């Protein structure tokens, strides 16, 4: 591995340098020893970096120039909906009345903020076909877990606490079985059929008296719509189970069909994906959960409700599973999502889904002669191709993903879902132009040609990035996670 990376801020440090100085305080201060117990006081000086202001500014400016995001390049990361985040969202989120409010302020001082929360709940109820919505969960997996805890409380309250199995398709997001386990359930896998949809016969085999729920994404992770969803609903409901909708792929069906109309009992959404609250870099996210009326009394508290002309928190929720997030979730993301929904309107959201589906099918059609396409039918917002043809020349999907970096394109999701050999999952979203799509397609085709005629160029990629191919085995076995470890290595 060759590195052209910047030195760490600690490596720039020189003793005695500082970025700025403060005036000498004329306020009498107490010693640390007089304020804290001895066990809380450091025995050694903290090793903070010491740099001049100019060095500090240059360091972080240099790092920022090396970042890659939707604002500076195509980001077709399958199942992540890396769409453009409109800048009007940021303007609204920075309105002082919102950005400077505090979650512990009295209700009468934050009526505008509470109205935003209430109004967003109402919008999401309409979009999903659910009867009630909580905005508390902080991310998609958090929303999954919240919904499953609601299911668990519901079954226990109905004397069916023995229901401890959650059915998960073999193409599901990895968070689905993880959330099920975290909520105290066992995961049971249902197979996909030759069309990439849930195998109905296998579903009938795994459903039993212990079934608590099935977790589905529709369209699924292969980008295929589960056309038998009503039959799936009937099978699971007849067995006493509930249907959970993973909202990761809602971008494909807005104003076309609603999860509630498909028979789902609960749904989580990703405001940081579908509704343009920016994501990547660790957050913050937002994973609201909607439920049918039979489950409404189990939602986390408090809920924000409208009482006449005012808005307030409602803690009187009979069977509530309790709080799942301090205060009331990530409010800044609510502002961005609400702005997006109000800007687009129902017609705009419908067009979003139509163009997202069109873009995915356009790419799929143009690449079909150059790559193996395991599922031939029209896809929705994303699709999965396979690199098995290129594997014949010793080039794997990982190598092609690395080569894409040389062309200024973020690689798609690779080796997921697990039921496609050498899989590459591509989601272009609706915000990309035809010119961008064509550039990406032509680039992938050229890489496929390189795999056949000049495989070493692909195998040794990337060639133009700050860091060349990583030694992933050593990185996994001997991770250097802090500066102390780096000093030891050197």
UniProtKB/Swiss-Prot annotation:
Enzyme type, top EC level: oxidoreductase
GO molecular function annotations of the record: glycine binding; glycine dehydrogenase (decarboxylating) activity; pyridoxal phosphate binding
Keywords on record: Oxidoreductase, Pyridoxal phosphate
Catalysis: reaction(s): N(6)-[(R)-lipoyl]-L-lysyl-[glycine-cleavage complex H protein] + glycine + H(+) = N(6)-[(R)-S(8)-aminomethyldihydrolipoyl]-L-lysyl-[glycine-cleavage complex H protein] + CO2
Sequence positions bearing N6-(pyridoxal phosphate)lysine: 273
Gene Ontology BP terms: glycine decarboxylation via glycine cleavage system
Single GO cellular component term: glycine cleavage complex
EC number annotated for this UniProt entry: 1.4.4.2
Cofactor: pyridoxal 5'-phosphate
Pfam families: Aminotran_5 (PF00266), GcvP2_C (PF21478)
Quaternary context: The glycine cleavage system is composed of four proteins: P, T, L and H. In this organism, the P 'protein' is a heterodimer of two subunits.
Function, in words: The glycine cleavage system catalyzes the degradation of glycine. The P protein binds the alpha-amino group of glycine through its pyridoxal phosphate cofactor; CO(2) is released and the remaining methylamine moiety is then transferred to the lipoamide cofactor of the H protein.
Similarity comment text for this entry: Belongs to the GcvP family. C-terminal subunit subfamily.
Protein name: Probable glycine dehydrogenase (decarboxylating) subunit 2
Originating organism: Staphylococcus aureus (strain bovine RF122 / ET3-1)
